[in-house]
Amino acid sequence: MSEQIEGRNAVLEAFRSGKCVDKLFVLDRCQDGPVRTIIREARKKDTIINFVQKERLDQLSETGAHQGVIAQVAAYEYSTVEDILEKAREKGEAPFIFLLDDIEDPHNLGAIIRTANLAGAHGVIIPKRHAVGLTSTVAKTSAGALNYTPVAKVSNLGQTIEELKKEGMWFVCADMGGELMYNLNLTGPMGVVIGNEGEGVSRLVK
């Protein structure tokens, strides 16, 4: 699957054919009929829409013929949180999930997915906004782990954590000021929260 789709007809067809579009970039103040239709389709799918200047679109464009719209498409299909929990149930294991708070670098996301797979995690949860999605770079860096590790995308990571707590899960955050992991009893239904490269775990998630 292509990582990026450009041009009005191609982008509209991507939405209508059911492709998983992570982000849509639209020329700011462009309000003609085809663009309005694309925006309407994007909102139906709850896609992140970024209204940007022409210079930004030109910078992102791989073809030089974006016509004011660029869609970034997930290289892999997303799972749901329930899919991840079901995977744990099928194995007869307590859920073990990695939750990533605004990871921006695709190489980092791919490496974390690889680590999650090696650690025996049942899946990874990422937020829809302010974070990289499942690009081809992520897939390549994961070294095949993306084929075995489901990734779910949620609107509100903090809310998802609260819902999982009700399911009996508990959570630890990777934090420079925290305790040594060797001093903790890391057993049972558990989630590991990893924060942004620069800011760490956000206050709302902590």
Task: List each model region and its residues.
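Short acidic active-site motifs
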Residues: 10, 34, 56, 156-160, ...
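Active-site/ligand-binding-proximal alpha/beta "capping" segment
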Residues: 172-206
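RNA substrate-binding interface of SAM-dependent RNA methyltransferases
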Residues: 16-19, 86-179, 183
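N-terminal positively charged helical leader segments and presequences
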Residues: 1-87
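Short secondary-structure boundary/capping elements
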Residues: 3-6, 79-80, 104-107, 152, ...
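Short basic, glycine-rich beta-strand/loop surfaces that mediate nucleic-acid
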Residues: 60-75, 142-145, 150, 187-195
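Hydrophobic/aromatic ligand-binding patch that stacks against planar heteroaromatic rings
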Residues: 13, 41, 115, 163, ...
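Glycine-rich nucleotide phosphate-binding loop and flanking beta-alpha elements
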Residues: 11-12, 32, 77-79, 106, ...
